[in-house]
Amino acid sequence: MNNSKGWILSLSINAFCVFGASGIYLDKLVNKWFGYEVLDLANSDNALVTGLATSSGILLYSSWASVMQESFHFLEKISMFDTFLVRVFQFCAFFFGGIVFYIFNHFLHKWLHESSQTGFLHDHFSVSDPSPSTAQNHRSPPASCKRLSSCESSGSPSSRVVGSLQGSYCPSGTHLHEGSLLLEDSSARHSSDSVHEYLVKKPSNCDCECHAHFSSFPTHSGTPDDIEHIHSVYTMGIQTALLICLHKVPEGFITFLASTVDTGFMVLVAMSIHNIVEGFTIAYPLYLAWKSRPKAFLTAATLSSCSLPLGSLIAFLVMEAGGIGSSDFLNFLYGIIFAGTAGMMLILSLRVILPEALRHDHSENKRHSFICFTIGILFTLFLEIFDSH
């Protein structure tokens, strides 16, 4: 069997993923084109929500309408199987694949969560320093303004930066407002585990020098949710990248197998679009975490270039092993693998990608996510109708 088509398509779709990773440069190109800032990927979740939700819709429809259909076509070719047996084996493989993938995803999340708690991820990855413009905007108070906090001795990452100044005094001797927050010195400001908090406004009862610059500081709400969000941006970026790259292994498997049948066009188109989105989805959280476009792009391109071809290699080895048996055995093997992979795709869509989109969606009733999710399904349906004609 000639497998060159499978390798060409797999590598081509992988190139789409690398192309998608370059999307983190999109705002620079757009802003340069217009001559002023119209797009800021670093401070907007809209692009990420759009990509994730649309990708989830494409995968959901593809898993059920395309991959499961391919599974049925293979299994119905087996002479000893009637339609009932075909459906039994197909749905058993479908649910088995979904359960295995769900368990795998559960333990992966658990391991990553424990790693973030023990500092494993922070010890093995570093965060780039803020850009000069960011550092300029985050000016620290004058040296005369000391930070006094009852939480300072706790030693936790957040308590080194954020604290309540209850009953504290500034150098001028003026009593500060209870609950005011001050930024620690500049060395803590660039720490990878720091949370930036600033005094919201200049205290009305103090006119000393140390409060003269507070009006220019960025402000944060200081709520526990905001602090937790800022503190977990780095870990979230690593988790998202690792999860999606590990999920791309079965995608490479699907792409390679789909290339062997004439009716695989729908899956290939869906996977091509999906990989453009996923390339951006891998690179974007890393860019948010590292604040470095080249580092995020190279990391995303490297991870995707390893994971998808690995799935294709596994499919190639399975096909070579199955080729030595009977045609019924080969059809059974392909049918079971396609059905199991469809179950994995369903869990990937509904359990991993869509919830991630909802988590970043701040629109009313998560409307943005559900609109993009529906568009993904309708777009895939349109491509299938177009392909059938």
UniProtKB/Swiss-Prot annotation:
Q: How does it sit in the membrane?
A: Multi-pass membrane protein
UniProt main location, coarse: endoplasmic reticulum
Could you tell me which InterPro entries the record lists for this protein? ZIP (IPR003689)
Output the Gene Ontology terms for molecular function. zinc ion transmembrane transporter activity
Transmembrane feature ranges: 6-26, 48-68, 88-108, 267-289, 305-325, 329-349, 368-388
Q: Keywords assigned by UniProt?
A: Endoplasmic reticulum, Ion transport, Membrane, Transmembrane, Transmembrane helix, Transport, Zinc, Zinc transport
Gene Ontology biological process terms in this record:
intracellular zinc ion homeostasis; zinc ion export from vacuole; zinc ion transmembrane transport
What's the short name of a Pfam family annotated to this entry?
A: Zip
Superkingdom per UniProt: Eukaryota
An example of a Gene Ontology cellular component annotation for this protein is: endoplasmic reticulum membrane
Compartments where found:
Endoplasmic reticulum membrane
Role summary: Probable zinc transporter that may mediate zinc remobilization from the endoplasmic reticulum under zinc limitation.
Q: Which family does it belong to?
A: Belongs to the ZIP transporter (TC 2.A.5) family.
- Name of the molecule in the record: Probable zinc transporter zip2
> What organism does this protein naturally occur in?
Schizosaccharomyces pombe (strain 972 / ATCC 24843) (Fission yeast)
